[in-house]
Amino acid sequence: MNTQDISKEWIDTFNHLGSEGKLKAPVDYHAIFEADELFGKKLYTLPMGYITLPTGRIFACDPLTHLAAVDNKTYIRTVNPGTYPIETKVAELDTDYYRYVLTRVLFKNTKPVQYELALKGHEDLNELEDGESYIGFPVDAGLATLVDEATVTAYREFDRHWYEQHPDGNIYDDYFDELFKLNAIAYPKFQRPGGDWINFKIPNTDLYVPMIQSGFGDGLYPVYWAFDEAGDICQIIIEFISCSSNE
């Protein structure tokens, strides 16, 4: 756990909330990934390739509005550097009408036995003590990503260079829009014609930025670490659509 620059008060509150079970996920996400149906809706699993994590320090954000920001912080927990598969659970809400429910990265082929809210060390934990069910990351452009700290550095350089070449441009309309459409042609399952996901390879690198439709669009989305029986982190999960019967 990376606790550098985090106050003792925050760490004490984090540990207290953990002991009270207030950092736990409301559902077993692994069971949902194994299921074919949720609340009467068919579920499908959509592989999205792989992402490389050179440092193992990661976080989730909206790639269009936050990835190039200068104040991004990673989660306090870290994983072993490596290349890992990423996949999304898709719900068919109506005939040929799909929405993405969960996205996960798999670090180990072990079964999760518990989940913990992913945090960065600067959040107001009083929200959880006061009854809020989770703290999440904001989405303002309808997309989400999970990336490594090193990927952020590479993406910022790509973004800076692109805008130098296109000072009056819009990077989504003038660059990513076409990539989403091409991906929908190449992988039409569970996508609208304009595209609902890409696994973007940053030019001149081996680093990928998955950009994934965030459920019903803009909002605040929680991220959870999954731990196996040995206490090792085996997955990280973004929840786009609530999987809890209590909501």
Residue ranges and their predicted role:
Residues 4-182:
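Extended, low-hydrophobicity segments enriched in charged/polar residues
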Residues 1-19, 149-247:
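Acidic, proline/glycine-rich low-complexity IDRs
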